[in-house]
Amino acid sequence: MKFAISTLLIILQAAAVFAAFPISDITVVSERTDASTAYLSDWFVVSFVFSTAGSDETIAGDATIEVSIPNELEFVQYPDSVDPSVSEFFTTAGVQVLSTAFDYDSHVLTFTFSDPGQVITDLEGVVFFTLKLSEQFTESASPGQHTFDFETSDQTYSPSVDLVALDRSQPIKLSNAVTGGVEWFVDIPGAFGDITNIDISTVQTPGTFDCSEVKYAVGSSLNEFGDFTPQDRTTFFSNSSSGEWIPITPASGLPVESFECGDGTISLSFAGELADDEVLRVSFLSNLADDVLEVQNVVNVDLTTADSRKRALTSFVLDEPFYRASRTDTAAFEAFAAVPADGDITSTSTAITSVTATVTHTTVTSVCYVCAETPVTVTYTAPVITNPIYYTTKVHVCNVCAETPITYTVTIPCETDEYAPAKPTGTEGEKIVTVITKEGGDKYTKTYEEVTYTKTYPKGGHEDHIVTVKTKEGGEKVTKTYEEVTYTKGPEIVTVVTKEGGEKVTTTYHDVPEVVTVITKEGGEKVTTTYPATYPATYTEGHSAGVPTSASTPPQATYTVSEAQVNLGSKSAVGLLAIVPMLFLAI
């Protein structure tokens, strides 16, 4: 009888080892779109969500979880390269949690925990891999929703993806793994416009090109995904009478006008028009060196129209990367705790202990995008921190605008044991926020000083002005200079051009009165706008632009106020307190 009981226990333990817990969800999205809409050629991010939240179950420190990966998805594995499925995953503080490996015959991905003799009591995180659709699946797939079934011993997860046709209204680049390298396809659709010349050139590559494998084809009878038929690319969609791909050489004739190829560069030109239903595909092969894990060929495509002018969007940089290893993040777990299997709590693995510590009743002025007639008050009270293993609080207020400051209060009570986060420092009422993070026993302090922004708009509106922002952080002083405000003044239109960080933003306002000075200060001071004594009242056709026919007293300023919106989030990161000035223009 004793033997029978032992046998039963062994069977029960084995069943628990391979159960899905603590995997709570499995998701699949396109890496290109970060959504469930994808091309057949896309990389797919497959995420395994681990969570013990709301459960009293624990996990054996050396437990194994097996997940059957659907045959439609596969790891891309090259000969003589590292297996992309083999990896070790850690907490954000560097504590190893588990390792993974994929059996290419059984199509089973195995997660093995790394703490023999321990019991895992707390686990939160996401392990993800990048996979491709199998060639066998793409040969028979149809556009529309497709469901992927991931099976465990006790549960099946079935995320779905909407497979769509290629966008044949613009140039695109696709890639495909081949033995020893990557095959790239640059597709130019005739429907893109009245094109007479196509110039394709590589800008950079980490590998080399096989010039003998540079080929082209022109096709019109595309499949339902808008693609060249994958079963036999050498038979269909070529302008060769034999139906074969034509290698690109100087002697290959029209439509190839010129061709140059070296180890690291390719340049070629095509002359002649494409019909609206035709697609030109140029194929070239990148060889992979043994130590290259990522190939990203940057290709320029320049198009010329029938009137010999370049298109408005002259150059298209097509830079889809191809990887021989999975793009995963080994720091996958935000929370992890394990205790000895005998039940005596003698050690604890701490992933992160962090808290946002602020001066009580700290006032934050936030003005952005949405306006409110009265101040918006947001109060957030964090719970008492009772878990010494992991706690993180992120408080963020955004998309709120007001003429007056937004009052924002954070109160974080702390326990007094050795695991309690650092207490708030500073004096109540100061305009200084101190952030203290306790992570692995280290302490970090950042001090931010209040910032005053001043923007000056000239009366004439033709000079450039400078705005200087000074920020004091950790004792260092940072100065950022922005080139400010140029006006182009017409009868009823003022165009404001702002250059910041090298980017140019243009906003056009109608019926805007001249502005002399606009000064915005944070810390609770109101926005002051000063207008000149007179305004151009009307403009008459036939007069020179910008010359008023009469003047009058300033119009009454009118403000349009919409309902305030508050977005208050809580995530696993250090708290963020943002201070942004708001500039109001009377229109």
Swiss-Prot record:
Chain residue ranges for the region called 4 X 24 AA approximate tandem repeats, Thr-rich: 432-531
GO-annotated cellular components: extracellular region; plasma membrane; side of membrane
Highest taxon above the source species: Eukaryota
Covalent lipid adducts (GPI-anchor amidated serine), residues: S562
Stretch forming the signal peptide: 1-19
Residues carrying a glycan: N239
Principal location class: membrane
Protein name: Putative adhesin
Prodomain residues: 563-587
Role of this protein: Putative adhesion protein. May be involved in cell-cell interaction, interacting with other proteins by salt bridges and hydrogen bonds.
Post-translational modification: The GPI-anchor is attached to the protein in the endoplasmic reticulum and serves to target the protein to the cell surface. There, the glucosamine-inositol phospholipid moiety is cleaved off and the GPI-modified mannoprotein is covalently attached via its lipidless GPI glycan remnant to the 1,6-beta-glucan of the outer cell wall layer.
Subcellular location(s) per record: Cell membrane; Secreted, Cell wall
Membrane topology: Lipid-anchor; GPI-anchor
Keywords assigned: Cell membrane, Cell wall, Disulfide bond, Glycoprotein, GPI-anchor, Lipoprotein, Membrane, Repeat, Secreted, Signal
Repeat positions for Sequence: 432-455, 466-489, 491-512, 513-531
Disulfide bridge map: C211-C261
